[in-house]
């Protein structure tokens, strides 16, 4: 089984000037599902570009679109699997913001846990068979990679889903999700 994960982030991870930071994304449980979504979204985007008088070279960013156009784009993806997390920055420990790399480590953690919860939901609903051979395809838009942690994002995701993780502070093991994770792209 091929699972495709597309994600993007919005906001600035800076607790002094910003209140929230958001990750959002889509998961497709087959290449056909992904192709269908891309076709539907491309069609909706064409209509929005005409209505909003946007040039082809410009990205259709939410900050410049009308609510009607944003709604049209969102509705084009209604039947697909969406996920997201909102980070309320003032609730986080101030040490997270002390270094650029600690900030990135926290963002990687938030992303990893969000994706993990979505996989767990799909397994519980029977949409994913965790015993099946699985290839994960991650497409993370403009993601910074340097952290001050043990793993970069790719390694952290692979550790979480293929091997399992151990929290040394609490002496607790969190088991792997996919026994037969054959590829991680």
Please place each PLM-identified region on the residue numbering.
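Phosphate-ester processing/binding pockets and catalytic centers
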Residues: 1-185
């Amino acid at each position: 089984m091929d699972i495709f994960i597309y994600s993007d982030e919005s906001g600035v991870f800076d607790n002094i000037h910003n209140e929230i930071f958001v990750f959002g994304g889509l998961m497709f449980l087959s290449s056909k599902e992904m192709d269908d979504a891309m076709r539907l979204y491309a069609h909706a985007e064409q209509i929005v570009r005409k209505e909003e008088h946007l040039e082809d070279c410009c990205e259709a960013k939410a900050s410049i679109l009308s609510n009607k156009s944003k709604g049209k784009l969102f509705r084009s993806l209604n039947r697909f699997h969406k996920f997201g997390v909102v980070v309320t920055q003032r609730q986080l420990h101030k040490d997270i913001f002390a270094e650029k790399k600690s900030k990135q480590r926290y963002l990687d953690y938030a992303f990893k846990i969000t994706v993990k919860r979505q996989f767990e939901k799909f397994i519980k609903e029977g949409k994913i068979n965790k015993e099946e051979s699985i290839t994960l395809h991650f497409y993370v838009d403009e993601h910074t990679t340097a952290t001050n942690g043990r793993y970069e994002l790719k390694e952290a995701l692979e550790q979480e889903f293929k091997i399992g993780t151990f929290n040394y502070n609490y002496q607790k093991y969190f088991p792997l999700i996919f026994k037969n994770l054959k590829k991680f792209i």
